[in-house]
């Protein structure tokens, strides 16, 4: 993901807000085993980094606005409407007919050969086209998100803690803060939400002990309903669903953004190659090429995150024993660690040009 953003010249504006992750610590409460994955062991400077979502979004919009205004070196013809809402979409003989409205309630109709819908988990494009969803997790869950001031350095360590009360993940932020996501069943999350700040921090301190020293204060928790699904038709001639519109994951291993950026970069490769050969962007071979490249990766990542969520929360003692020893084996056996780290860093599947640091104008090698 970082290399994609670097290649797109977006990284310089984001770097000051990025905090590196140099180690990932995975453990299960009441089990002696644990696993650590470090950047040093993997031969990289960092395993990843944490950037505030609002900052990433604002920089992306800024880059699009500058491109639309002709202020970038890229020779692109871009018309930007932000915000905008898709009102209807239908297929004609020659193209798609898309009606959308702007913030000023202006109605605009366009006729593109290719529609790329990256409009989130509640995608209006997907719903208007009646594309069905396949639920990929049986869990009814919610997530509580907050940021916490800590009394000691987080040492750039991300924690994934599996407990009977849910899965707790912490990410290192700037200035002795951590970002925290607590995933659990709805009843547990509702109970956590009703706690006072002091009681909530005390509950969290019990789970994390004093790895962060004293938990000092937290922002008001935000609650999100969780879903895990994949669209049954992610691509068809002239249409591609991207990001959460195509697949929404449980936030277990922070793979949603990695997956979306990889999808985008592979699709960009396919479009760039089609433009070079004057291939119609609605040609069925393009959508099929995209599906062939990405569906296996989607299935692997969704299976991986759901497996972690469901298996580690099991209270069946033989399974707990297996997981406990599984963490120990992974900590001792380098190939297991390497495989997990590649998943966490998003370095699996087909490598697009952007993922390899090449622009779309450069030749593949």
Write out the residue ranges for each language-model feature:
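Conserved FAD-binding catalytic core of PHBH/FMO-like flavoproteins
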Residues: 101-109, 114-221
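Residue-level signal for inorganic ion chemistry
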Residues: 5, 60, 170
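Glycine-rich FAD cofactor-binding loop and adjacent beta-loop-alpha segment at the N-terminus
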Residues: 1-21
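C-terminal helical "tail/cap" subdomain of flavin- and related membrane-associated enzymes
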Residues: 269-365
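FAD/FMN-dependent oxidoreductases across multiple families
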Residues: 190-282
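Pyridoxal 5′-phosphate
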Residues: 91, 154, 260
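A general structural signal for well-ordered alpha-helical segments in protein cores
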Residues: 2, 23, 53-57, 61, ...
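Conserved N-terminal helical subregion
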Residues: 14-128, 137-141
């Amino acid at each position: 993901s970082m290399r994609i953003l670097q290649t797109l010249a977006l990284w310089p504006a984001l770097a000051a807000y990025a905090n590196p992750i140099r180690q990932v610590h995975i453990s299960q409460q009441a089990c002696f085993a644990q696993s650590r994955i470090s950047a040093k062991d993997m031969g990289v400077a960092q395993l990843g980094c944490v950037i505030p979502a609002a900052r990433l979004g604002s920089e992306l919009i800024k880059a699009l606005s500058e491109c639309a205004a002709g202020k970038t070196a890229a020779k692109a013809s871009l018309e930007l409407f932000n915000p905008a809402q898709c009102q209807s979409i239908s297929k004609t003989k020659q193209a798609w007919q898309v009606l959308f409205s702007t913030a000023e309630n202006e109605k605009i109709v366009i006729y593109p050969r290719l529609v790329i819908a990256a409009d989130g988990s509640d995608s209006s494009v997907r719903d208007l086209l009646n594309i069905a969803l396949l639920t990929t997790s049986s869990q009814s869950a919610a997530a509580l998100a907050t940021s916490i001031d800590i009394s000691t350095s987080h040492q750039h360590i991300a924690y994934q803690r599996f407990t009977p009360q849910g899965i707790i993940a912490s990410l290192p932020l700037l200035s002795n803060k951590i970002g925290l996501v607590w995933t659990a069943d709805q009843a547990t999350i509702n109970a956590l939400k009703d706690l006072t700040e002091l009681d909530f921090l005390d509950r969290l301190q019990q789970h994390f002990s004093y790895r962060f020293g004293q938990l000092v204060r937290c922002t008001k928790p935000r609650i999100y309903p969780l879903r895990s699904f994949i669209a049954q038709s992610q691509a068809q001639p002239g249409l591609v669903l991207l990001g959460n519109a195509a697949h929404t994951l449980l936030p277990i291993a922070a793979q949603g953004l990695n997956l979306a950026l990889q999808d985008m970069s592979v699709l960009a490769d396919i479009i760039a190659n089609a433009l070079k050969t004057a291939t119609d962007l609605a040609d069925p071979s393009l959508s099929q090429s995209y599906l062939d490249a990405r569906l296996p990766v989607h299935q692997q990542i969704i299976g991986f995150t759901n497996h972690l969520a469901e298996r580690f929360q099991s209270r069946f003692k033989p399974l707990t024993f297996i997981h406990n020893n599984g963490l120990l084996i992974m900590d001792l056996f380098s190939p297991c660690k390497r495989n997990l780290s590649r998943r966490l860093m998003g370095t699996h599947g087909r490598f697009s040009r952007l993922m390899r640091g090449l622009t779309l104008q450069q030749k593949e090698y």
